[in-house]
Amino acid sequence: MFRSLLKRTTFLNQLNKSNGFNRNYFKQSTLTRSDALSRHVETEDNNEHTPFDFTQENLVKVEKILAKYPKQYRQSALIPLLDLAQRQNGGWISLRAMDKVAHICGIAPMTAYEVASFYTMFNRTKIGENFVQVCTTTPCMLRGSGEIIKTCKSHLGIQVGETTPDNKFTLVEVECLGACVNAPMMCINDDFYEDLTSASTINLLDQIKNNKPTKIGPQTHRKAAEGPQGKTTLLEPPVGPTCRDDL
Protein backbone atom coordinates (compact mmCIF):
# COMPACT_ATOMS: atom_id res chain seq x y z
CA MET A 1 0.00 0.00 0.00
CA PHE A 2 2.77 2.43 1.01
CA ARG A 3 4.88 1.50 -2.03
CA SER A 4 1.91 2.08 -4.36
CA LEU A 5 1.25 5.48 -2.79
CA LEU A 6 4.94 6.41 -3.09
CA LYS A 7 4.98 5.48 -6.80
CA ARG A 8 1.86 7.57 -7.44
CA THR A 9 3.34 10.58 -5.61
CA THR A 10 6.63 10.28 -7.54
CA PHE A 11 4.72 10.06 -10.84
CA LEU A 12 2.68 13.18 -10.09
CA ASN A 13 5.77 15.09 -8.98
CA GLN A 14 7.51 14.25 -12.25
CA LEU A 15 4.48 15.40 -14.25
CA ASN A 16 4.33 18.56 -12.21
CA LYS A 17 7.90 19.43 -13.20
CA SER A 18 7.46 18.74 -16.91
CA ASN A 19 5.29 20.18 -19.66
CA GLY A 20 3.52 22.58 -17.31
CA PHE A 21 1.33 19.85 -15.79
CA ASN A 22 -0.48 20.74 -12.60
CA ARG A 23 -0.92 17.92 -10.08
CA ASN A 24 -4.32 19.42 -9.23
CA TYR A 25 -5.53 18.02 -12.57
CA PHE A 26 -5.29 14.53 -11.05
CA LYS A 27 -6.98 15.20 -7.73
CA GLN A 28 -10.54 14.30 -6.90
CA SER A 29 -13.15 16.91 -7.73
CA THR A 30 -14.15 19.27 -4.96
CA LEU A 31 -17.35 18.21 -3.25
CA THR A 32 -20.31 20.14 -4.55
CA ARG A 33 -22.12 22.30 -2.04
CA SER A 34 -25.24 20.16 -2.21
CA ASP A 35 -23.12 17.19 -1.12
CA ALA A 36 -21.15 19.15 1.47
CA LEU A 37 -23.70 18.07 4.06
CA SER A 38 -25.17 14.62 3.42
CA ARG A 39 -27.54 15.20 6.33
CA HIS A 40 -29.24 18.22 7.83
CA VAL A 41 -27.41 19.88 10.72
CA GLU A 42 -29.39 22.14 13.03
CA THR A 43 -28.10 25.71 13.23
CA GLU A 44 -29.51 28.90 14.70
CA ASP A 45 -30.66 30.11 11.29
CA ASN A 46 -31.63 26.75 9.80
CA ASN A 47 -33.81 24.50 11.92
CA GLU A 48 -37.39 23.29 12.14
CA HIS A 49 -38.41 26.46 13.96
CA THR A 50 -36.81 28.93 11.53
CA PRO A 51 -39.70 30.84 9.92
CA PHE A 52 -40.13 30.93 6.15
CA ASP A 53 -43.00 31.99 3.95
CA PHE A 54 -43.21 33.35 0.45
CA THR A 55 -43.66 37.09 0.09
CA GLN A 56 -46.90 38.37 -1.42
CA GLU A 57 -45.06 39.09 -4.65
CA ASN A 58 -43.67 35.57 -4.79
CA LEU A 59 -47.02 34.02 -3.88
CA VAL A 60 -48.30 35.46 -7.16
CA LYS A 61 -45.36 33.77 -8.91
CA VAL A 62 -46.16 30.52 -7.10
CA GLU A 63 -49.68 30.55 -8.57
CA LYS A 64 -48.31 31.26 -12.05
CA ILE A 65 -45.91 28.33 -11.74
CA LEU A 66 -48.62 25.96 -10.49
CA ALA A 67 -50.91 27.02 -13.34
CA LYS A 68 -48.48 25.43 -15.82
CA TYR A 69 -49.27 21.94 -14.53
CA PRO A 70 -52.47 19.90 -14.15
CA LYS A 71 -53.78 19.97 -10.57
CA GLN A 72 -53.09 16.27 -10.10
CA TYR A 73 -49.44 16.88 -11.02
CA ARG A 74 -48.62 19.75 -8.68
CA GLN A 75 -45.44 17.92 -7.71
CA SER A 76 -44.06 18.80 -11.14
CA ALA A 77 -43.62 22.35 -9.85
CA LEU A 78 -41.14 21.20 -7.20
CA ILE A 79 -37.91 22.38 -8.86
CA PRO A 80 -39.11 25.84 -10.00
CA LEU A 81 -40.65 26.43 -6.56
CA LEU A 82 -37.45 25.39 -4.80
CA ASP A 83 -35.59 27.82 -7.04
CA LEU A 84 -38.03 30.60 -6.20
CA ALA A 85 -37.63 29.90 -2.48
CA GLN A 86 -33.85 29.90 -2.79
CA ARG A 87 -33.82 33.24 -4.59
CA GLN A 88 -36.04 34.80 -1.94
CA ASN A 89 -33.83 33.37 0.81
CA GLY A 90 -30.59 34.99 -0.37
CA GLY A 91 -29.26 32.20 -2.57
CA TRP A 92 -29.70 29.24 -0.25
CA ILE A 93 -32.65 27.09 0.78
CA SER A 94 -33.47 26.38 4.41
CA LEU A 95 -35.19 23.38 5.96
CA ARG A 96 -38.43 25.30 6.50
CA ALA A 97 -38.33 26.63 2.94
CA MET A 98 -38.18 23.06 1.63
CA ASP A 99 -41.04 22.11 3.95
CA LYS A 100 -43.11 25.01 2.61
CA VAL A 101 -42.52 23.99 -1.00
CA ALA A 102 -43.35 20.36 -0.20
CA HIS A 103 -46.65 21.45 1.38
CA ILE A 104 -47.57 23.52 -1.69
CA CYS A 105 -46.76 20.62 -4.01
CA GLY A 106 -48.64 18.12 -1.86
CA ILE A 107 -45.65 15.82 -1.40
CA ALA A 108 -43.69 14.44 1.55
CA PRO A 109 -40.98 16.80 2.84
CA MET A 110 -38.40 14.06 2.26
CA THR A 111 -39.04 14.28 -1.49
CA ALA A 112 -38.14 17.97 -1.45
CA TYR A 113 -35.02 17.21 0.63
CA GLU A 114 -33.95 14.54 -1.86
CA VAL A 115 -34.29 16.87 -4.84
CA ALA A 116 -32.53 19.77 -3.11
CA SER A 117 -29.62 17.55 -2.09
CA PHE A 118 -29.33 15.94 -5.55
CA TYR A 119 -29.09 19.03 -7.75
CA THR A 120 -25.95 21.10 -7.25
CA MET A 121 -27.81 24.30 -8.13
CA PHE A 122 -29.49 24.22 -4.72
CA ASN A 123 -27.43 25.44 -1.77
CA ARG A 124 -28.47 24.05 1.60
CA THR A 125 -26.05 26.20 3.55
CA LYS A 126 -25.63 29.96 3.51
CA ILE A 127 -23.58 31.56 0.74
CA GLY A 128 -22.21 35.04 0.20
CA GLU A 129 -23.87 37.83 -1.73
CA ASN A 130 -21.95 36.82 -4.87
CA PHE A 131 -21.70 33.09 -5.62
CA VAL A 132 -18.49 32.59 -7.64
CA GLN A 133 -18.58 29.26 -9.49
CA VAL A 134 -15.40 28.51 -11.45
CA CYS A 135 -15.65 25.72 -14.01
CA THR A 136 -12.79 23.21 -13.72
CA THR A 137 -13.95 20.55 -16.20
CA THR A 138 -11.51 19.41 -18.91
CA PRO A 139 -12.00 22.17 -21.57
CA CYS A 140 -11.67 24.93 -18.96
CA MET A 141 -8.78 23.10 -17.29
CA LEU A 142 -6.90 22.94 -20.60
CA ARG A 143 -7.50 26.65 -21.08
CA GLY A 144 -6.22 27.66 -17.66
CA SER A 145 -9.00 27.34 -15.09
CA GLY A 146 -6.41 26.30 -12.52
CA GLU A 147 -4.89 29.76 -12.73
CA ILE A 148 -8.34 31.35 -12.44
CA ILE A 149 -9.04 29.39 -9.24
CA LYS A 150 -5.64 30.38 -7.88
CA THR A 151 -6.33 34.03 -8.72
CA CYS A 152 -9.74 33.96 -7.01
CA LYS A 153 -8.34 32.37 -3.87
CA SER A 154 -5.46 34.83 -3.69
CA HIS A 155 -7.50 37.95 -4.45
CA LEU A 156 -10.44 37.07 -2.20
CA GLY A 157 -8.29 35.64 0.57
CA ILE A 158 -10.35 32.46 0.90
CA GLN A 159 -10.17 28.81 -0.10
CA VAL A 160 -12.61 26.91 -2.31
CA GLY A 161 -15.84 26.36 -0.39
CA GLU A 162 -15.34 29.39 1.87
CA THR A 163 -17.03 32.78 2.16
CA THR A 164 -15.25 36.11 2.64
CA PRO A 165 -15.56 37.71 6.11
CA ASP A 166 -17.66 40.56 4.66
CA ASN A 167 -20.06 37.96 3.18
CA LYS A 168 -19.52 39.41 -0.30
CA PHE A 169 -18.20 36.28 -2.03
CA THR A 170 -18.44 32.50 -1.79
CA LEU A 171 -16.00 30.55 -4.00
CA VAL A 172 -16.65 27.05 -5.36
CA GLU A 173 -15.46 24.79 -8.17
CA VAL A 174 -18.17 23.39 -10.44
CA GLU A 175 -18.47 20.96 -13.31
CA CYS A 176 -19.24 21.98 -16.90
CA LEU A 177 -21.46 25.05 -17.26
CA GLY A 178 -21.89 24.60 -21.02
CA ALA A 179 -19.69 27.43 -22.31
CA CYS A 180 -16.68 25.30 -23.27
CA VAL A 181 -15.88 27.24 -26.43
CA ASN A 182 -15.31 30.33 -24.28
CA ALA A 183 -13.11 28.62 -21.70
CA PRO A 184 -11.96 29.37 -19.09
CA MET A 185 -15.12 30.75 -17.56
CA MET A 186 -17.00 31.23 -14.33
CA CYS A 187 -20.56 31.96 -13.30
CA ILE A 188 -21.28 34.61 -10.68
CA ASN A 189 -24.88 34.34 -9.51
CA ASP A 190 -26.79 34.12 -12.83
CA ASP A 191 -24.17 35.69 -15.12
CA PHE A 192 -21.48 33.99 -17.24
CA TYR A 193 -18.01 35.54 -17.54
CA GLU A 194 -15.92 33.92 -20.26
CA ASP A 195 -12.47 34.00 -21.91
CA LEU A 196 -10.96 34.84 -18.55
CA THR A 197 -7.40 35.74 -17.63
CA SER A 198 -5.99 36.43 -14.19
CA ALA A 199 -6.13 40.17 -14.90
CA SER A 200 -9.73 40.16 -16.13
CA THR A 201 -10.78 37.97 -13.19
CA ILE A 202 -9.33 40.42 -10.67
CA ASN A 203 -10.98 43.31 -12.51
CA LEU A 204 -14.38 41.57 -12.41
CA LEU A 205 -14.13 40.75 -8.72
CA ASP A 206 -13.19 44.34 -7.91
CA GLN A 207 -16.05 45.74 -9.99
CA ILE A 208 -18.56 43.46 -8.26
CA LYS A 209 -17.17 44.24 -4.82
CA ASN A 210 -17.57 47.97 -5.49
CA ASN A 211 -21.08 47.51 -6.96
CA LYS A 212 -19.97 48.64 -10.42
CA PRO A 213 -21.50 47.30 -13.67
CA THR A 214 -19.66 44.42 -15.31
CA LYS A 215 -19.31 43.17 -18.86
CA ILE A 216 -21.23 39.89 -19.03
CA GLY A 217 -20.04 37.22 -21.47
CA PRO A 218 -16.62 37.09 -23.18
CA GLN A 219 -14.03 39.33 -21.56
CA THR A 220 -12.24 39.74 -24.90
CA HIS A 221 -13.18 41.47 -28.15
CA ARG A 222 -15.01 38.49 -29.59
CA LYS A 223 -18.79 38.24 -29.74
CA ALA A 224 -20.56 35.25 -28.19
CA ALA A 225 -18.90 32.00 -29.32
CA GLU A 226 -17.30 33.15 -32.58
CA GLY A 227 -13.69 32.10 -33.15
CA PRO A 228 -10.68 34.23 -32.23
CA GLN A 229 -10.44 35.40 -35.87
CA GLY A 230 -13.98 36.72 -35.81
CA LYS A 231 -16.84 35.57 -37.99
CA THR A 232 -15.52 33.79 -41.11
CA THR A 233 -18.64 32.00 -42.43
CA LEU A 234 -22.38 32.67 -42.76
CA LEU A 235 -21.64 36.33 -43.44
CA GLU A 236 -24.91 37.00 -45.30
CA PRO A 237 -28.16 37.89 -43.49
CA PRO A 238 -30.03 34.69 -42.50
CA VAL A 239 -32.80 33.51 -44.79
CA GLY A 240 -36.07 33.88 -42.87
CA PRO A 241 -38.31 33.13 -41.26
CA THR A 242 -36.00 31.75 -38.58
CA CYS A 243 -38.64 31.17 -35.92
CA ARG A 244 -42.37 31.31 -35.31
CA ASP A 245 -44.05 34.67 -35.72
CA ASP A 246 -45.53 34.54 -32.23
CA LEU A 247 -42.13 34.28 -30.49
Curated annotation (Swiss-Prot):
<comment type="similarity">
    <text>Belongs to the complex I 24 kDa subunit family.</text>
</comment>
<feature type="binding site">
    <location>
        <position position="180"/>
    </location>
    <ligand>
        <name>[2Fe-2S] cluster</name>
    </ligand>
</feature>
<feature type="transit peptide" description="Mitochondrion">
    <location>
        <begin position="1"/>
        <end position="40"/>
    </location>
</feature>
<keyword id="KW-0001">2Fe-2S</keyword>
<keyword id="KW-0520">NAD</keyword>
<dbReference type="GO" id="GO:0051537">
    <property type="term" value="F:2 iron, 2 sulfur cluster binding"/>
</dbReference>
<dbReference type="GO" id="GO:0046872">
    <property type="term" value="F:metal ion binding"/>
</dbReference>
<dbReference type="GO" id="GO:0006120">
    <property type="term" value="P:mitochondrial electron transport, NADH to ubiquinone"/>
</dbReference>
<dbReference type="GO" id="GO:0008137">
    <property type="term" value="F:NADH dehydrogenase (ubiquinone) activity"/>
</dbReference>
<keyword id="KW-0999">Mitochondrion inner membrane</keyword>
<keyword id="KW-0679">Respiratory chain</keyword>
<dbReference type="Pfam" id="PF01257">
    <property type="entry name" value="2Fe-2S_thioredx"/>
</dbReference>
<keyword id="KW-0479">Metal-binding</keyword>
<dbReference type="InterPro" id="IPR036249">
    <property type="entry name" value="Thioredoxin-like_sf"/>
</dbReference>
<keyword id="KW-0560">Oxidoreductase</keyword>
<keyword id="KW-0408">Iron</keyword>
<protein>
    <recommendedName>
        <fullName>NADH dehydrogenase [ubiquinone] flavoprotein 2, mitochondrial</fullName>
        <ecNumber>7.1.1.2</ecNumber>
    </recommendedName>
</protein>
<comment type="subunit">
    <text>Complex I is composed of 45 different subunits. This is a component of the flavoprotein-sulfur (FP) fragment of the enzyme.</text>
</comment>
<feature type="binding site">
    <location>
        <position position="176"/>
    </location>
    <ligand>
        <name>[2Fe-2S] cluster</name>
    </ligand>
</feature>
<feature type="binding site">
    <location>
        <position position="140"/>
    </location>
    <ligand>
        <name>[2Fe-2S] cluster</name>
    </ligand>
</feature>
<feature type="binding site">
    <location>
        <position position="135"/>
    </location>
    <ligand>
        <name>[2Fe-2S] cluster</name>
    </ligand>
</feature>
<keyword id="KW-0830">Ubiquinone</keyword>
<dbReference type="InterPro" id="IPR042128">
    <property type="entry name" value="NuoE_dom"/>
</dbReference>
<dbReference type="GO" id="GO:0045271">
    <property type="term" value="C:respiratory chain complex I"/>
</dbReference>
<comment type="function">
    <text>Core subunit of the mitochondrial membrane respiratory chain NADH dehydrogenase (Complex I) that is believed to belong to the minimal assembly required for catalysis. Complex I functions in the transfer of electrons from NADH to the respiratory chain. The immediate electron acceptor for the enzyme is believed to be ubiquinone.</text>
</comment>
<keyword id="KW-0496">Mitochondrion</keyword>
<keyword id="KW-0472">Membrane</keyword>
<keyword id="KW-0411">Iron-sulfur</keyword>
<dbReference type="InterPro" id="IPR041921">
    <property type="entry name" value="NuoE_N"/>
</dbReference>
<keyword id="KW-0809">Transit peptide</keyword>
<feature type="region of interest" description="Disordered">
    <location>
        <begin position="211"/>
        <end position="247"/>
    </location>
</feature>
<dbReference type="InterPro" id="IPR002023">
    <property type="entry name" value="NuoE-like"/>
</dbReference>
<keyword id="KW-0249">Electron transport</keyword>
<keyword id="KW-1278">Translocase</keyword>
<dbReference type="GO" id="GO:0005743">
    <property type="term" value="C:mitochondrial inner membrane"/>
</dbReference>
<keyword id="KW-0813">Transport</keyword>
